[in-house]
């Protein structure tokens, strides 16, 4: 199994992802620089968190114009597995691989804390090792995580079960209090219609080892391996 982790100027979570893939779940992994023109031999692309290009213009906007982003789009169109975490999620929306946009947090502040999220769809390649409606605790760290889309788009993704994760309390109840950024319907992560592209704001790579106090995030990566095998 070969994972490719994209590196943009300003990315800062690629090493965490690399460690989890290489040292925790023991899969082949390599970095792919933003001006590369090939994803040859890659089974799963990870677009990590950070501040690509300093978040200038708009989060993810400049990264979406890079050479590797064209390759990511083509890879996804062929059915390749793609996951975007935090800034990676923002980039995937800029690439139109996922619907909607990520706006400034409702509080207008950078938010860095643990959040509870509910598994809304456990039948995907990203969540098949989680139980349906399970509640896991995953940290967030972002200023633009306020997910928004039109009413028509929202109706569509609900009908197609594209909502994968939602913010909730420790009992699995969604509320405004449990929503850290103002995201519509408390959405924390969703997939494309085909189910091969996932974007989420929480950082599963930061809770994938016991030494970090939790392994709630590891099953996301293991689910991908399980599916692709």
Where are these regions (language model features)?
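Glycine-rich nucleotide phosphate-binding loop and flanking beta-alpha elements
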Residues: 52-53, 89-91, 147, 171
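Residue-level detector of functionally special positions within alpha-helical transmembrane segments
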Residues: 49, 86-87, 142, 203
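Amide-donor transfer/coupling interface in amidating biosynthetic enzymes
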Residues: 73-77, 102-229
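N-terminal beta1-alpha1 cap of cysteine-dependent amidohydrolase-like domains
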Residues: 1-85, 92-99, 105-111, 118, ...
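Short, flexible active-site-adjacent loop segments at beta-strand->alpha-helix junctions, enriched
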Residues: 88-89, 123
């Amino acid at each position: 199994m070969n994972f490719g982790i994209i590196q943009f100027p300003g990315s800062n979570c690629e090493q965490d992802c690399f460690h989890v893939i290489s040292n925790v779940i023991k899969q082949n992994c390599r970095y792919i620089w933003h001006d590369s023109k090939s994803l040859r031999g890659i089974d799963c692309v990870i677009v990590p968190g950070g501040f690509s290009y300093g978040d200038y213009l708009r989060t993810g906007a400049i990264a979406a114009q890079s050479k590797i982003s064209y390759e990511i789009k083509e890879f996804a169109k062929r059915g390749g597995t793609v996951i975007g975490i935090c800034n990676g999620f923002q980039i995937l929306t800029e690439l139109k691989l996922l619907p909607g946009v990520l706006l400034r947090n409702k509080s207008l502040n950078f938010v860095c804390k643990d959040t509870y999220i509910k598994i809304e769809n456990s039948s995907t390649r990203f969540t098949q090792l989680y139980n349906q409606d399970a509640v896991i605790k995953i940290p967030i760290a972002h200023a633009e995580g306020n997910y928004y889309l039109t009413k028509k788009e929202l109706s569509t993704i609900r009908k197609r079960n594209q909502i994968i994760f939602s913010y909730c309390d420790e009992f699995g109840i969604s509320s405004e209090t449990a929503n850290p950024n103002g995201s519509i319907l408390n959405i924390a992560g969703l997939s494309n219609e085909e189910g091969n592209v996932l974007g989420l704001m929480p950082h599963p790579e930061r809770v994938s080892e016991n030494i970090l106090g939790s392994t709630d995030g590891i099953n996301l990566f293991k689910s991908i391996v399980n599916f692709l095998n």
